[in-house]
């Protein structure tokens, strides 16, 4: 076993006629990537989902959730909820923009000085031509 164990070498031990190792791994069914990993490390990586396993042990999403829970503001049921429906926006931003544009267009047409007088959102007052 003093051979070069580089990831580019693809020589398989042909002394084992059945293709099984002493751990019971069938080398003939391994992908080239798995074969390289097995030759380099002597074992195959775990097949379980690591991220899901980590999320089961996690109690809080971040320090803010921990602080709110400790203060009693939220219940433990509300801390981590994997609900995809919460990611949806409450309003349609493009519809909101359209309504604002329509409102501005309707208020700017005809009687502009009367309807916009005293309005907070009308912007700065018009300048006199002398200044």
UniProtKB/Swiss-Prot annotation:
GO function term, MF aspect, one: protein phosphatase inhibitor activity
Composition bias, Low complexity: 106-122
Compartment list: Cytoplasm; Nucleus
GO biological process assignments: cellular response to heat; negative regulation of nuclear-transcribed mRNA catabolic process, deadenylation-dependent decay; positive regulation of G1 to G0 transition; positive regulation of mitotic cell cycle phase transition
Mod. after translation: Phosphorylated by RIM15.
Entry keyword annotation includes Nucleus: yes
Record-annotated membrane-spanning stretches: none
N-acetylserine modification, residue list: 2
Residue spans of biased composition, Polar residues class: 1-13
Keywords: Acetylation, Cytoplasm, Nucleus, Phosphoprotein
Pfam families (alphabetical): Endosulfine
UniProt keyword Phosphoprotein present: yes
Listed GO CC annotations: cytoplasm; nucleus
Modified residues annotated as Phosphoserine in this record: 6, 63, 108, 119
Chain residue ranges for the region called Disordered: 1-26, 81-131
Primary location recorded for the protein, binned into one broad class: cytoplasm
Note: Present with 1400 molecules/cell in log phase SD medium.
Family of this protein: Belongs to the endosulfine family.
Role description: Required for TORC1 to properly control gene expression and chronological life span. Plays an essential role in initiation of the G0 program by preventing the degradation of specific nutrient-regulated mRNAs via the 5'-3' mRNA decay pathway.
Protein name (database record): mRNA stability protein IGO2
Organism: Saccharomyces cerevisiae (strain ATCC 204508 / S288c)
Lineage: Eukaryota, Fungi, Dikarya, Ascomycota, Saccharomycotina
């Amino acid at each position: 076993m003093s051979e070069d164990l580089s990831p580019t070498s693809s020589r398989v031990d042909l002394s084992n006629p059945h293709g099984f190792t002493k751990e019971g791994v069938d080398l003939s069914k391994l992908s080239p990537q798995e074969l390289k990993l097995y030759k380099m490390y002597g074992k195959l990586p775990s097949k379980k989902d690591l991220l899901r396993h980590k999320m089961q042990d996690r109690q809080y999403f971040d320090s803010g959730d921990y602080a709110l829970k400790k203060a009693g503001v939220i219940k433990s049921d509300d801390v981590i909820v994997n609900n995809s429906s919460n990611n949806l926006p409450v309003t349609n931003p493009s519809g909101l923009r359209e309504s604002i544009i329509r409102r501005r267009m309707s208020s700017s047409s005809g009687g502009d000085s009367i309807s916009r007088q005293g309005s907070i959102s009308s912007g700065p007052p018009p300048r006199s031509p002398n200044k």
